[in-house]
Regions:
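Helix-to-loop junction immediately C-terminal to a conserved catalytic motif
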Residues: 25, 284
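Conserved ABC ATPase "signature" region
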Residues: 91-109, 339-354
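Conserved ABC ATPase signature
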Residues: 113-117, 121, 358-362, 366
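H-loop/switch region of ABC-family ATPase nucleotide-binding domains
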Residues: 173-174, 418-419
Length: 465
């Protein structure tokens, strides 16, 4: 890989994308155990012979889960942390933090508590902390997995900026469409081997069946369409009347009116920090500070009762994986689990080979599938998925979509917080749009509503805006 080159690594979950990034930043062999054959050279030096602090000055890493790379509790300290460890004078350090926030246009995220940021905002701070150190090589492991469409466009501009600065960029990613204009080469991995190296032009020539057979997501969102027909709305079973949600006395959403019927799959969209996760937590009874009425089958249902009838798959699934094996996780905390259902769900989601593995040893996409499997087995009537396709390849995304359709057929009420246009077109019947504390749009997922859906997901002319 030469200077100023942008190389995209793609392939199914667990194919070795993250392992390659760990080889380049020295985490293999200096942190992760295993057998290493062959050599990895950075600037002509073997990586295993370079001290970690010197590697960190040359190679900047943005991990798949930004939470794993934070060392501070506020955003300014986090951005400054790397350069602080280079012992820069306080004045230069302050200037670099200022320059970083200006270059990346994240002034609004300054002086914020990291624990109060949305997943997408955390991702921006993780990138900023690396950018501040001005490394020559950038490694990004699925940097878009927590971002809304507007933030993905901002990420694309950031990548364009560092490319202009003469940096080398290595990206492991499932979402491919936003990188087609930036990547110089696309490396396709399968089961730990390089199976193909393409130019963007060659990659565009792949037919849709070929691409799907390789387990790859769409390269052009303009070629993704919702179903033509719209099923009639079912009788409402869940109703929200005049619901207002607050966080630390600040109103997040106000006067929300909504109804949902059995079998409905409802997408929830909005920019990072619009209140989508707060809304989903309130549905499940996990958020206390709210006014208004929640009704189930026309009867008021209090917060504690909602806790009992609902299940939520969180954006960061590491928070809800507790057991020592994948199989045990699928029945963790469930009275009298149906073992036949457990086996069938593991098989459907491609998790049977990993049933004895500890969940924490799985890739990000595999962990996501485990959490989705639990939602299938738990038997609750109201299911909420917060970004269920973050970190998922095409195969896993279609498996999760199929599972959600099955849950819908079982009469579950399903809400999906997502930024994934491809997934929404495959699974959702409606999309709710949150913006500035309100819910201005409730849009059916049909061909008739395609222009509005593309507007909500910022899809334009085959690229995102």
């Amino acid at each position: 890989i030469s200077d100023v080159e942008c190389v995209l690594f793609c392939g199914r979950s667990g194919c070795g994308k993250t392992t390659i990034t760990r080889l380049v930043n020295g985490l293999i062999p200096q942190f992760y155990q295993g057998e290493l054959h062959g050599r990895v050279l950075v600037d002509g030096q073997e990586i295993s012979n370079i001290p970690m602090y010197q590697i960190a000055a040359k190679v900047g890493s943005v991990f798949q889960n930004p939470r794993t790379q934070f060392f501070n509790v506020d955003t300014d300290s986090e951005i400054a942390f790397g350069i602080e460890n280079e012992a820069r004078p306080p004045k230069k350090l302050a200037e670099r933090v200022e320059q970083t926030t200006e270059d990346l246009r994240i002034q609004k995220l300054r002086n914020r508590n990291i624990f109060e940021l949305s997943g997408g905002e955390k991702q921006k701070i993780a990138f900023a902390s690396v950018y501040a150190m001005n490394p020559q090589i950038y490694l990004l492991d699925e940097p878009s997995s927590n971002l809304d469409m507007t933030s993905i466009q901002e990420l694309k501009e950031h990548l364009r900026l560092i490319k202009k600065q003469g940096k080398t960029v290595l990206i492991a990613e499932h979402r491919l469409y936003y990188l087609m204009e930036l990547a110089d080469r696309i490396v396709y991995l399968e089961k730990g081997e390089i199976k193909g190296i393409y130019t963007p032009e060659e990659f565009w020539q792949l037919s849709e069946p070929d691409r799907e057979h390789m387990g790859l997501r769409a390269v052009d969102l303009q070629a993704v369409f919702p179903p033509k027909a719209h099923l009639p709305a079912p009788t409402p079973v869940l109703e929200l009347r005049n619901v207002t949600l607050r966080y630390k006395k600040q109103t997040i959403l106000h006067d929300i009116e909504l109804s949902a019927g059995k079998g409905e799959v409802i997408g929830v969209v909005g920019h990072n920090g619009a209140g989508k996760t707060t809304f989903s937590r309130a549905l499940c009874g996990l958020h206390k500070d709210c006014d208004g009425q929640f009704l189930w089958e026309r009867k008021p249902i209090e917060r504690k009762a909602r806790l009992k009838c609902s299940y939520m798959v969180m954006q960061d699934v590491n928070y809800e994986l507790f057991a020592d094996s994948v199989e045990a996780e699928c029945s963790f905390g469930i009275r009298n689990p149906d073992q036949t259902l457990v086996n069938a769900t593991l098989e459907e989601l491609g998790l049977t080979p990993y049933r004895e593995r500890h969940p924490n040893t799985l890739s990000g996409g595999q962990k996501q599938r485990v959490a989705v499997a639990v939602s299938m087995i738990c038997g609750k009537d109201l299911l909420v998925f917060d970004e269920p396709t973050s970190g998922l390849d095409f195969d896993s995304m279609t498996q999760v979509a199929g599972l959600i359709r099955r849950l819908s057929d079982m009469g579950k009420v399903i809400f999906i917080v997502t930024h994934d246009f491809e997934f929404v077109c495959r699974t959702c019947s409606r999309v709710l749009h949150f913006d500035e504390g309100e819910m201005p749009d409730d849009v059916p997922v049909t061909m008739d509503a395609l222009p509005k859906l593309r507007e909500l997901f910022s899809v334009s002319d085959g690229k995102e805006r």
